Amino acid sequence: MSAARFSIGIDLGTTNSALAYAPLAGDAAPEALPIQQWETPETVAEMPMLPSFLYLPEDALAPQLRGKVPETQAWIVGRLARRRAAEIPGRVVRSAKSWLCHHTADRDASILPWGSEDIGPDQKNLAGARLCFDPELSARGLEQPLCRLRFR
């Protein structure tokens, strides 16, 4: 195993999530890692913070999204998901940490989005929702993606 080269800070927030890194060698200041995310169904942007929202697109929208970003899954994360929460709340998971940390929550049950009648129980399983940081980090001197976060 190779020696660590970076110090990494991850904030998995209820509202926003972020990742920063700094090389262990030298005096470089930490840098926020831009996170690729959907801005609209047509555009992708890199932003320093990722809104902590998951959106399950309607069947008519899903084909427009596939193939535009590597590893696009059924669930969409970030700014587009946050925007859709106001428009179609039954298809968006928000405050997941709060729900899953509640003492009465069954963390293995398909409960999110809570109270939604817009999607079926089989679609409430978040196992397929994942966030993959930009694999082209080698351009910034990193050989591998910093991390892969999986929602289970």
Indicate where each model-derived feature is located:
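Gly/Thr-rich phosphate-binding beta-strand-loop-beta motif of the actin/hexokinase/Hsp70
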Residues: S2-A29
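Phosphate-binding loop and its immediate beta->loop->alpha context
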Residues: E31-R152
